[in-house]
């Protein structure tokens, strides 16, 4: 298997830079629906020309439609996808479940890739993506070589991994920091990169504990090829074209020669861009402080070197398509020229019948010289054979015309758009909103939050992390409420037997439902006699996504908390829907344990990731930003960290606004609250008190996310 090198194309110049520097494929966006809306991107006409430019040179084009979209946006996205199909795009990257379902209906012949924004990080998640018809999965950047190897070995579809470029602190597709703090949604391509700002602990914002160095896995290219990784991806649609050229050229050589980089190549990668050096941490299975770094404000681009790079790729003659030319010139027959490329395309063109020479006859060498003049085209004459009868006269113009026609037909063949089925977009069926008031549900984070006083208030559901259920005695509460086991949104393939056992034990204790937050959770819950609920980590943004997950077996679902009130109201709710109306909104889930990085922790480095530590970090200081806002850091499965918003979403005094949106459930999300605080909040939402906590926010309920 040949490993593909995939390079970023944030604009036309970056596209040329990537192609001329050796990329096998490029990924790009056009229109409004891609994960880098701030990049230059492409208009419809530019995209069509870009696809032809790439296909002529044997380079594939992948369109990024990997953002979440609203119901009102879905028709426009469908139109963009149809245009892309008509242009001959090779594949489309998707994140949104509604987009996935829509594209499979309107352009069923276009391959779809699961974007890293889908948060796929386990073998089961990849296998589910294959079951759903996707042909490639882009894995989370946080996976180690061993985890990647296992997935590659057993995956029924192609695996793509990031090999170079920026690392997000949060798992892709799960970051809400930019949206909640500044309305700029990272899951909608508008991330403001708040992770690069100063933060700290103990009330001081004196460091950059969320700013990871760029990844550089160049030393592991041969190993990744041998693991069976189908595609190595370079990050950088927001970076300069010269950067794209420099990095692509080096990785292309490493792949071509199946080797590790030289010291000089590593220096060039660092010169192109770095943040206090690079990191290999996640790939090597290492987490810790050494992975973090910043780029000095006074850092400058290497303009002299970049000028040299730019001068090379602007000539556009570094990436030529080699052709084998075979010319036959026989007396009494039309001249014929056959051109064949390495991809199996063959064209044959004919010209005039040559005349007998009146003076000097043309030679085979002269014919070959004329045919090899491919300058100004994307072709080179790698081989040229001439079969020539003696005593014939052929003009230079006739040979030039023969060559030009052959190259034009070859270009037409290489850029031909495949015939594909295209269907009209049909909006999801409208389902009338539920007229009743939503039932209140509660989500717990700690065992002590479950109390008799809380259950006495009769919440409709209680969501509990599956790992906490073993600590709880549910028997006094059974029959008074429903308990749902919440699976961790981030885990590992090797954790699945543990999680399955926990679910089976939970069912024996009276738990009647499972809340899933990742595609890989579906196999874990299959076969259990329980309800399936779609949790907020699924990022359910539109009616098509709700319909998709209903088909996967969900009986209810929580919609994205990025949606504003009107957007929630307008959803066609084909299954009972829930929205979060209270609590600290989750901002990030991170592979690095922030408390361990700050204070040190032997558990972080000395025990299996699937075993919870003793919880000493639960009382660690909160994260503090430049404005003095404090963000609680909670412990998540596998000693990961979950950063919560400093402000608490509070809508008890706005009950008429969320009770009239057609919701079946309204969730109170408890994280740092004590047992008594949980009771007080539930009473407030039941209208029994008017007590509100300090430092509240309305979240995105009235304003939505960009």
Language model: regions and residue ranges:
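Surface-exposed amphipathic alpha-helical tracts and adjacent flexible/coil segments at the periphery
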Residues: 1-21, 25-35, 48-85, 94, ...
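Glycine-rich, highly charged phosphate/nucleotide-binding loops
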Residues: 42-47
